[in-house]
Design a protein with these regions (language model features):
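Short glycine-rich anion-binding loops that position phosphate/pyrophosphate groups of nucleotides
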Residues: 137-140, 202-204, 315-316
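Glycine-rich phosphate-binding loop and adjoining helix at the ATP-binding site
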Residues: 96-195, 322-332
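Short glycine-aspartate micro-motif
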Residues: 65, 75-79, 129-133, 196-200, ...
Length: 383
């Protein structure tokens, strides 16, 4: 039993006493208490003052409750998106849903992006962080901090991003492929599923697999590029250089292009599509796109042997009938649907929770374990 497991259990429970944590993990209270004391010292866990709660005095001395630290902003999170870049300072005990503090349009070159970061940095009071956690699209080698290929943001390719970010904030930088961050965040907030395929719709369409509580890893850094599956009959060119990719149909841009073609509107905005689906439901052109999307997702389920799909992103902004159509089509196409139940669930994006989990896994737990082996305590960041 280590810090990681106890902190993970506390994340699931929300708040708990030392005794409750010990019982849930099958530990003796002294053992659990020792781990808790270490986490308190490291600034990962905090104690909650329950003496001010109504009825506390009447019930006698209540047990001291614990939770993941929510007071101290330990990390800086960055979402590098195709159209916008968002930033937030985050504690270890992050909220279940994302709320970003700062935003600026993602520019077309690295130096302009750095200038945008520097401008935001002047507005952030805290200057020392345990790490800078970056959600990034494309094919990302997370271990080496290199963007192998980014169809929609070619300027991010290579290994320049970590050093560019460190020129603004002097802290370790962790790159996390964006759909993997979303899947990990969903698992942190909603634990217990044996596995799921998360599919996110936005400026592109990507996915991530989580099996037995862990993100799937592969020999190659590429994974989850479901949006670059070619669709028969689709002649649109994709930013990856290929023709016919699924995301040219079902990304925001792809859906708006189809709306323009079928409504004779020039350059319709997303709000127009939202309103149109509310008024007309799933029109034939949209039904075809959803059916083609479902075929690709069902094929992925058939390949990996999962029964749960988590849908996040732009499609959920349309009328609920759109989600229901997609869910039914996935169920019809997945082979397990003939024997058992296919679960297709909508969910909010939980990118921040995934980034924090990645930061702890790749920066904090290895450092504390190494220092423990050497006989030194892990030094928390300044308050």
């Amino acid at each position: 039993m280590n810090r990681r497991e106890l902190a993970g259990r506390l994340q699931t429970m929300g708040t708990a006493s030392r005794a409750a944590l010990a019982k849930s993990l099958g530990l003796s209270q002294p053992t659990a208490g020792k781990i808790v004391d270490q986490l308190l010292k490291e600034g990962i866990v905090e104690e909650i003052d329950t003496t001010a709660e109504p009825g506390a005095a009447k019930a006698g001395r209540p047990p001291q409750l614990l939770r993941l630290d929510r007071r101290h902003r330990r990390f800086l999170a960055i979402q590098l998106g195709v159209t916008d870049t968002r930033l937030a300072t985050l504690p270890v005990g992050v909220a279940e849903e994302d709320h970003w503090d700062f935003q600026f349009p993602t520019p077309a070159c690295a130096q302009a992006w750095r200038a945008g970061l520097a401008k935001i940095a002047r507005r952030i009071a805290r200057t020392e962080f345990w790490g800078v956690l970056v959600s990034i699209p494309g094919v990302v080698d997370e271990q080496t901090g290199r963007v192998v290929f980014s169809p929609n943001l070619h300027w991010t390719e290579g290994d320049k991003l970590p050093s560019l970010i460190r020129s603004v904030w002097d802290a370790p930088v962790v790159l996390v492929q964006e759909e993997r961050a979303l899947a990990l965040g969903h698992q942190v907030v909603k634990p217990g599923a044996p596995g799921f395929l998360l599919v996110d719709f936005g400026e592109g369409i990507g996915s991530a697999l989580l099996v037995r509580g862990r993100l799937q890893t592969n020999p190659l850094p590429i994974s989850g590029e479901i949006g670059h599956t070619p669709v028969f009959g689709n002649t649109r060119w994709c930013g990856c250089g290929a023709r016919g990719c699924l995301e040219t149909l079902v990304s925001r841009r792809g859906l708006l292009q189809s709306l323009a073609e079928h409504s004779k509107r020039r350059n319709p905005q997303w709000a127009v599509l939202v309103q149109r689906t509310q008024q007309r439901g799933v029109e034939p052109w949209l039904a075809r796109t959803l059916d083609q999307t479902a075929i690709v997702i069902a094929g992925a389920l058939n390949m990996v042997g999962l029964q749960q799909v988590i849908i996040t992103g732009a499609l959920l902004e349309l009328t609920p009938e759109v989600f229901r159509h997609l869910a039914q089509a996935i169920t019809c196409g997945a082979m397990w649907g003939r024997f058992g139940k296919i679960e297709v669930q909508p969910a909010p994006r939980r990118r921040m929770a995934g980034l924090i989990a990645s930061g702890l896994d790749r920066l904090i737990w290895p450092a504390s374990q190494a220092q423990e082996r050497s006989g030194h305590e892990f030094a928390s960041a300044p308050n």
